[in-house]
């Protein structure tokens, strides 16, 4: 049965986009940027913005006051704006895009299987001259109708690379609106580590993000820019009928030996000091938690 599901999707191309179609799923890649711009199930579009690279985070107290990340690593804050499409190729049910700029080369590959599972592969190369990023990942806005979540990973509350040992691995669920806490001073929040899958669902169905390896994920009711700009919770500009979903390879730890000097940064083991990062995850229809779990099992063990 899985051999049949591996057949190539139908690829169609226009000046503006490349479309992959298989069964009830249509995935669209923007021909100008190389980014995934649409994921529709049975004609219902679930994405509200393109899936774009993210190397930054809304500054934590330690980032702002001690590590001073805006001064030391500020190039990463606007790096996505400097990435320009270098090549875009479509063949055998897959689209490969390469974007470059600012000392960064990022290759993204989207492959749609006949059962609607869209594999997203990410390969990042960083120039030696660049400082370390705070995050390696992708983010997009998804339909606000996806008002419930289920995930398999560490929880139930937020946790980070250097703050996760007390968070037990399990399956957690709730209202999407409650996924991330609200800090008095808005900042990075809501991350979950070692996530096998995250399902978001509503009355009309759902979607799952399942990793070939453990992921970091978070879901916010606002953009990262809005979170970073506000100084009080009531100042956060909230999204209208959308959730921002981060699906990340990794994020730096929060540190905190103190909060007023460079000692506030995380130890080297929890910083992103490598110059090459790669990961892969699948986006697939998932109307129930059982659907999400089955997809995750297939994805995680595909190459074993």
Region roles according to the model:
Residues 2-304:
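Beta-strand/loop-rich accessory regions of lumenal/periplasmic or secreted enzymes
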């Amino acid at each position: 049965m899985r051999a049949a599901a591996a057949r190539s999707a139908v690829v169609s191309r226009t000046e503006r986009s490349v479309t992959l179609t298989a069964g009830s799923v249509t995935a669209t890649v923007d021909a100008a940027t190389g980014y995934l711009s649409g994921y529709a199930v049975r004609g219902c579009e679930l994405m509200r913005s393109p899936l774009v690279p993210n190397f930054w985070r809304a500054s934590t107290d330690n980032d702002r006051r001690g590590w001073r990340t805006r001064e030391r690593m500020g190039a990463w804050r606007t790096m996505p704006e400097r990435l320009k499409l270098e090549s875009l190729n479509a063949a055998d049910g897959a689209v490969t895009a390469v974007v470059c700029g600012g000392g960064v080369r990022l290759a993204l590959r989207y492959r749609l299987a006949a059962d609607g599972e869209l594999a997203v592969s990410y390969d990042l190369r960083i120039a030696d001259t660049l400082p370390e990023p705070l995050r390696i990942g992708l983010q997009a806005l998804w339909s606000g109708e996806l008002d419930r979540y289920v995930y398999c990973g560490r929880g139930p509350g937020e946790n980070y690379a250097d703050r996760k040992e007390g968070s037990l691995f399990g399956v957690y669920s709730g209202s999407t609106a409650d996924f991330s806490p609200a800090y008095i001073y808005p900042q990075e929040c809501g991350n979950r580590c070692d996530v096998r899958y995250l399902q978001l669902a509503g009355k009309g169905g759902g979607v799952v993000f399942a990793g070939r390896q453990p992921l970091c994920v978070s879901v916010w009711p606002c953009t990262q820019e809005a979170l970073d700009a506000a100084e009080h919770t009531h100042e956060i500009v909230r999204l209208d009928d959308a959730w921002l979903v981060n699906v990340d390879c990794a994020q730096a730890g929060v540190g905190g030996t103190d909060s007023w000097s460079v000692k506030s940064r995380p130890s080297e083991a929890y910083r992103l000091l490598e110059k090459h990062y790669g990961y892969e995850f699948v986006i697939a229809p998932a109307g129930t938690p059982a659907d999400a779990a089955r997809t995750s099992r297939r994805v995680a063990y595909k190459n074993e």
